[in-house]
């Protein structure tokens, strides 16, 4: 493989040609099943458990007809994320660097913002365990939650470090979480007469699409609409799926699942229990021979199927949680926020089914949320590893200069958002320096991919444990929820450029790897939808 790197780290683009090998033989769907359900499991952590039930409990069924539309729009986004990896064995972030390095580094900054407040991901799961166990005894609730947050972070680190293959760890955890959440909530619905009694009205609402008269691709808001809930609605739209940056994990899971040309690329394996696998700095393409095209089409059809499975699995989970909220919370006029949605329903189940009912509901909430830390740490570690291993390696010679440039770039995006929380601001000053130093040092000293990955995953967990004891930066948390909608629009636009224009020019198979016109149009529609939603939110907030 050609390793000479001539392009400028800022003003050039990733231009190393692909290695060329035949398309990997398709082994059957059962052998590669995984990325779709991982995506579904991740998606269940916020929109499905928190935001959609909140909207239903407060506004009834006003928005439900829009939910399947927003869910299906995630399909085209995922499909093109997976297509690039299927054709090249590279992550989509490598593709963004092939568009241009400046664009690649902008996308990297978006990712760092999204994963900056890592301590919060275990908060709700820890709250569930505190409510169930009341452990440690004698401690106040806040201290108990912090204890469980630290413990869950340590458990997360140990599982990932000792799991032989990082992807398999995430796959198992997310699959268990997705199945427990899906069937647990379905069982809760079926076991509750009050919920079943409103089933007819609930499902009839899917046929009542209330359209914004000014912008038909946006929903009309109800008469009692609270403008402050605009951010909730936008977040619900984005998280009718994983959302924004989170969706890009699908590209990595396709890669480590050995799909298509990724079968020629090694996986991330544990330095403690796994055997090292070679991970090249650039991907592997194929020529347009009849045999290769036949195999390629099998992989693409499987990508469609796997992606559809994840979208539908996630969509029906939203149906169960929204139905439960409509049957229990809405009639009582209860509109609790965040984790309170589950605890309130847990108390209702305690009245109906006794203490076991409350515990079951809290356990379901735990399964919804515990898995997020695994996937967040895995995804951020992969993104950092890609930029250090592919973007910096072989292109930088000075650690101080590289650290300074990286630090300034990241600080511009992150530090202003943490103003108002002095201790957190101080932590981020140090954190961004360590990230920059780790990336520069690993690139110059030729670290292997997995060494970068596990080093950053460890840093991710350490920072998460520290953040538990700090004041959360409200500006950052609010910004990330809205930023993800903008990122979804930006990344969809990037995929239109990458897969329709750039990929056919640099791939030996040319137009054979380009999406069809139908796919292009559907992704274009999705992109317009995300841009309109972003603009609408800005307009509403500015008055």
Regions found by a protein language model. Name each.
Residues 36, 136-162, 179-186, 396-412, ...:
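Transmembrane alpha-helical segments of multi-pass small-molecule transport proteins
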Residues 1-49, 264, 271-284, 291, ...:
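Membrane-interface "cap" regions at the ends of multi-pass membrane proteins
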